[in-house]
Amino acid sequence: MPAVDKLLLEEALQDSPQTRSLLSVFEEDAGTLTDYTNQLLQAMQRVYGAQNEMCLATQQLSRQLLAYEKQNFALGKGDEEVISTLHYFSKVMDELNGLHSELAKQLADTMVLPVIQFREKDLTEVSTLKDLFGLASNEHDLSMAKYSRLPKRKENERVKTDVAKEVAAARRKQHLSSLQYYCALNALQYRKRAAMMEPLIGFAHGQINFFKKGAEMFSKSMDGFLSSVTDMVQSIQVELEAEADKMRVSQQELLSVSESVYTPDIDVATPQINRNLIQKTGYLNLRNKTGLVTTTWERLYFFTQGGNLMCQPRGAVAGGLIQDLDNCSVMAVDCEDRRYCFQISTPSGKPGIILQAESRKEYEEWICAINNISRQIYLTDNPEAVAIKLNQTALQAVTPITSFGKKQESFYFSQNIKNSDTGYVKIVPKAAASIPETEELIAPGTPIQFDIVLPATEFLDQNRGSRRINPFGETEDDSFPDAEDSLLQQMFIVRFLGSMAVKTDSTTEVIYEAMRQVLAARAIHNIFRTTESHLMVTSQTLRLIDPQTQVSRACFELTSVTQFAAHQENKRLVGFVIRVPESTGEESLSTYIFESNSEGEKICYAINLGKEIIEVQKDPEALARLMLSVPLTNDGKYVLLNDQADDTGGSPSDHRGAESEA
């Protein structure tokens, strides 16, 4: 090793300027060494801290690998191999953590500690001796200054002797401190070289020992394991690349569709509508009432499940029941100036929820699907075929054609028009020969009229002359007796749904078939507006009265009513057949279908009682017996129903507003 610079101890006593200049160089070197040593210690402490952190990190990593098994992943299929592999790696991490802990201890003992000792012992010693040398030099300078001021008079010899002794003591002290200081500075030149090498030797030995033990511990046992894990990862990568290619192809195919897939209601004129659905899914807007007059619309996901309409909000795990669709009715409605709205009503006719579809196609398919489900055809062996046949029949009801397919089976509705408490009647199949075919009841292609009963304003505009002409062709009050002279007066709130010509009035099946065709036509053609009227049943006539003007819109003689019946499932539907003479001498038959606010069987009961009154009016005794069997009002009129006030809501003048929505 090259020789180092040294301070000459022989020159310490003389303390010449040259010696002082050389001393300042050594002091500057010691100061630089002190700064560097502090920075070196910080770097080595950082390495030691990182190694300690590595110990803690590997320990935490080992625990986290074991925690994978306890995560209960929702999609945990095929994780068995991953779990076993992670368990093995956790064991490896524990062993590796032991090596890291040992390395951290070695770094602390052989790298960090020597630097700390060098700084605290050698550098601190030099700094202390520097301070002592400075104090001794100051004392020597003061004593020399005092000695230099001694006077020349002989009488001060004693003082001179004392000052001389003081100078000698100060000079001896300075000489001793300078010798110690010079020796420490000379020794520092050697110690700094060793102090720089020792920590690095300790660091290198620690790392070598760490890697050597690690190689001995893992080289043999880990080779086979790492090879198998590598093969497994590579196979997963191959599967991933293959799946990614498939997804890219699928993505390109899905994105290559036309713009119509993204644009709602792009084909408004001629949408491709499937009317044979027995299940349906999709987003709809649900109307919710938030106050007396305020509403909100919420977009939710709806789907049918058997005979139930289910709703599942976004983010929910499962759907909930919204409404039972069995025997319900669905019809388009005009709601808050929104398009594509429809309402689902309960089997009793009570209005239910209102929904909005996003397009005409979705709107009509939802209506058709709910109609199909409400008929419970999903319970049959081949519901798709039944749905196709039913919808073909519904289309034939409103489409002029020349031939019909024969019905495969018919249904018979049992009724008792005098029993107002009759409940829900099940559909019972009968022999096909005992029930008339559809062609025997209603001619194929018979048109259906939906606007025979005109609104009051239009009726008044057409009849501002001296005589009013009824839209049905009937004359006004001149031809019929006043209701005040009738023994029977019963009023019901009804809405006209449609009318059509029929071929026979020998069975109530013709009314049921007309109801089916009218409702099917309304659903297919999205006709939802109806005109509300008051149906006044007397012992002579049936009157349809405008609730706003109290003007009769139509009037039929009770004797011309040959059949009347209420629907056995939707109890608010009622219809009757009218026989009207023609100018040619023949008679025509027409069926009129209404929806009532009360049960249709009550209207049938009133009509039946009116016809009985007509029959017994010629026989005073029979009339008296009939009057005794029926409760009467104070003025002698018949009281038909206990809840008459509830059905009619009071006098006819109390009802205003001709338009309603079915």
Curated annotation (Swiss-Prot):
One of its GO terms (cellular component) is vesicle. SMART domains: PH, PTB. It comes from the Eukaryota. GO terms for molecular function: identical protein binding; phosphatidylinositol binding; phosphatidylserine binding; protein homodimerization activity; protein-containing complex binding. The keyword Phosphoprotein does not apply. Residues 277-375 form the PH domain. It is found in: Early endosome membrane; Nucleus; Cell membrane; Endosome membrane. Pfam families: BAR_3, PH, PID. One of its GO terms (biological process) is regulation of toll-like receptor 4 signaling pathway. Residues 3-268 form the BAR domain. It is a peripheral membrane protein. Residues 643-662 are annotated as: Disordered. Keywords: Cell cycle, Cell membrane, Cell projection, Cytoplasm, Cytoplasmic vesicle, Endosome, Membrane, Nucleus. Multifunctional adapter protein that binds to various membrane receptors, nuclear factors and signaling proteins to regulate many processes, such as cell proliferation, immune response, endosomal trafficking and cell metabolism. Regulates signaling pathway leading to cell proliferation through interaction with RAB5A and subunits of the NuRD/MeCP1 complex. Plays a role in immune response by modulating phagocytosis, inflammatory and innate immune responses. PANTHER family: ADAPTOR PROTEIN, PHOSPHOTYROSINE INTERACTION, PH DOMAIN AND LEUCINE ZIPPER-CONTAINING 2, DCC-INTERACTING PROTEIN 13-BETA. Homodimer. Homotetramer. Binds RAB5A/Rab5 through an N-terminal domain. This interaction is essential for its recruitment to endosomal membranes as well as its role in cell proliferation. Binds subunits of the NuRD/MeCP1 complex. Interacts with FSHR; interaction is independent of follicle stimulating hormone stimulation. Interacts with APPL1; the interaction is decreased by adiponectin in a time-dependent manner. The BAR domain is necessary and sufficient for mediating homotypic and heterotypic interactions; associates with cytoplasmic membrane structures; mediates interaction with TBC1D1 and ADIPOR1. The PH and PID domains mediate phosphoinositide binding. The PID domain mediates phosphatidylserine binding and allows localization to cytosolic membrane structures and nucleus. The PH domain allows localization to the plasma membrane, cytosolic vesicles and distinct nuclear and perinuclear structures and is sufficient for RUVBL2 interaction. This is DCC-interacting protein 13-beta. It comes from Rattus norvegicus (Rat).
